[in-house]
Regions:
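Sequence-level preference for short, compositionally simple segments enriched
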Residues: 24-322
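Short, small-residue-biased leader/transition segments that mark boundaries at the very start
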Residues: 1-6
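Bacterial N-terminal signal peptides
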Residues: 7-17
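Sec/Tat signal peptide C-region and signal peptidase I cleavage site
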Residues: 18-23
Length: 322
């Protein structure tokens, strides 16, 4: 048919070897480029996400050039195996300004970026909710499993990162996360390594709602806890639900961390179930003398279980360190 005709002409034109490459590229495009000035494949990130085929078995990279993208970005549940890579963490910015006080919107619809698909990686970009200080305003809302965030910045105030799905596994490496109150919250299992957690107000860093049957909630390893000038009274966490699990291991605490360390959310019952743990932390705020009695100081033996393999349950087919 006519298809063969075109193909034959291509062979004459290209030579045989390149034809195979050409036809393969026609079938799949591995990299989509997003740029504000129209020189890429798309001008906004949502369009690029919508161009990705459902449930792919190969990885597509969406490369986002420097610029400010004012978008409410949704990665739907049928999109998987996608990497969103910015040109630079400082200058590739996804931003929006919804907050919970707009038309009774509620916290859970205020996100700038919502990730419902599995096996999604974000790298070298900023996700921001810039709704000023107007109630809960989520920058990142995750529902997917096996999500990775590498060298990203998360800017917001209250409720910056909502890890919304029980049993979902998330990895944050070398990220900067700032906020005011409960700025990392939810039921998912998440490992944060080499991250900076920056408190903009006297408040609480985490509000985990880990289910009772899940061993690991939030685990922070080798992270740095910093604060804005004048911020002096910050708690490591308070339990959004009973059985909240949060651990800080080999982290550096500024002097803004309160001696008590943890808060019961004005409910003494939470003290019986909360799974709060610390080990090997340094800095002014890491002194354990004043810590609440119901938080655990791990032994050298106990801390050994906090490996990526255990946290992410390697047998369940995902292990980002391979």
């Amino acid at each position: 048919g006519s298809e063969m005709c075109i193909r034959d002409r291509l062979i004459l034109f290209l030579g045989v070897g390149e034809t195979a490459v050409y036809s393969q590229q026609q079938q799949r495009k591995d990299t989509l480029v997003v740029t504000r000035d129209g020189t890429g494949d798309y001008r906004n990130i949502q369009e690029a996400v919508e161009a990705v085929r459902a449930f792919m078995d190969y990885t597509v990279t969406i490369y986002i050039k420097n610029g400010t993208y004012k978008e409410k970005l949704v990665i739907p549940s049928w999109v998987k195996n996608v990497q969103l890579v910015g040109e630079s963490a400082e200058n590739t910015i996804i931003t929006y300004d919804d907050h919970a006080n707009i038309n009774k919107m509620g916290t859970f619809r205020t996100y700038t970026v919502k990730v419902s698909g599995n096996d999604i990686t974000f790298k070298d970009l900023t996700i921001e909710n810039n709704a000023a200080s107007l109630g809960q305003a989520v920058a990142l809302h995750t529902e997917g499993d096996r999500l990775m965030f590498i060298n990203c910045r998360f800017l917001g105030n209250q409720d910056t990162i909502y890890t919304g799905s029980e049993g979902a596994r998330l990895l944050f490496t070398n990220c900067y996360i700032e906020g005011t109150t409960d700025f990392i919250f939810g039921p998912s299992t998440a490992l944060f390594e080499y991250c900076e957690l920056h408190s903009k107000r006297d408040s609480y860093i985490t509000a985990a709602s880990t289910p009772q049957n899940i061993e690991f909630g939030y685990v922070f390893k080798n992270c740095k806890l910093t604060a804005a000038p004048g911020v002096k009274k910050v708690y490591l966490g308070r339990p959004w639900r009973p059985y909240a699990a949060t651990a800080f291991i080999n982290c550096e605490f500024g002097n803004h961390i309160r001696p008590e360390g943890w808060h019961n959310w004005k409910n003494p019952e939470n003290e019986k179930t909360a799974r709060y743990a610390e080990f090997g932390n340094t800095g002014e705020g890491a002194k354990t003398e004043g810590r609440v009695a119901w938080a655990e100081q791990l032994t050298k033996k106990e801390v050994l279980k906090y490996t990526p393999e255990n946290i992410f349950k390697e047998d369940s087919n995902w292990y980002p360190y391979k």
